[in-house]
Amino acid sequence: MGKGNEDPDLHCSSIQCSTDQPPFQQISFTEKGSDEKKPFKGKGKTAFSHSSEKHTQRQAGSDPNPNKENSEETKLKAGNSTAGSEPESSSYQENCRKRKISSKDICQDRAGNCPEEECNLTLNKKSRSSTAVHNSEIQETCDAHHRGSSRACTGRSKRHRSRALEVQTPSLRKSLVTSVRAMSEAVYQDLAQVWAQQIHSPLTCEQLTLLTRLRGPLCAQVQTLYSMATQAAYVFPAESWLVPATLPGPGDSALDREAHPFPGQEITEPVSGSDEAKLGAP
């Protein structure tokens, strides 16, 4: 009966040990004495606790916490990545800057500006071109209006000038022609008076020669002046009294000169006493 009572306790203790201890440290001994069994239980517990502590220490010493290791590794990796990414980022930024600068230089060398600047320039050029076209159209319209007005003004001024010339030039020409004709008429009258005086008081041969020498150039000058006046007048016809008769040459005698008087001069011959007696006789 004693054995029968001891068996369930042993089984319970073995079950408890199996639940408390890991599977590889399950140790069960079946002894007959209850007194011997109790100290064994305490020893087993202490041994189990010591073994579990040693096992945990070994695990702590040999196998550290994987989460901590992973966190430390991630921190180290992050530090390395940040430490490596900082120079990489700085070098990348420098490369980007160099590329931008080189692209700007290339764009400036080729086209003078970069695409962004080209877009801005194209927009500015378009706006400027539109404003320039608008201004040019306005200027063209203003110029056309100004030209039309200037043409109208010039046409009016030309018409006014032509009318003024038509009004003024005849008076000037008329005064010029009349003055020249009056001068030529006066010269001819002087010549006629000289020849009339020669009849009443005959001149010497020297005076006659000088008179004939003066007569030729004077008549020529008068004729040229009159012809010029006629050409200037365009309208006034030549007067009949200005057309001179054939002038005698320098070798002609006084009788021939008397036979060819100037136009408008009357022939007056001196009458002798015998002729008067003949005329007075019945």
UniProtKB/Swiss-Prot annotation:
Nucleus in keyword set:
yes
Q: Which of UniProt's keywords are assigned here?
A: Nucleus
User: Where in the cell?
Assistant: Nucleus
Stretches with biased composition (Basic and acidic residues): 1-10
Question: Which segments carry the region annotation Disordered?
Answer: 1-96, 249-282
Q: Where is the composition biased (Polar residues)?
A: 13-31, 58-68, 79-94
Name the family the entry cites.
Answer: Belongs to the FRG2 family.
**Record-given protein name:** Protein FRG2-like-2
Species of the source: Homo sapiens
Gene this protein is translated from: FRG2C
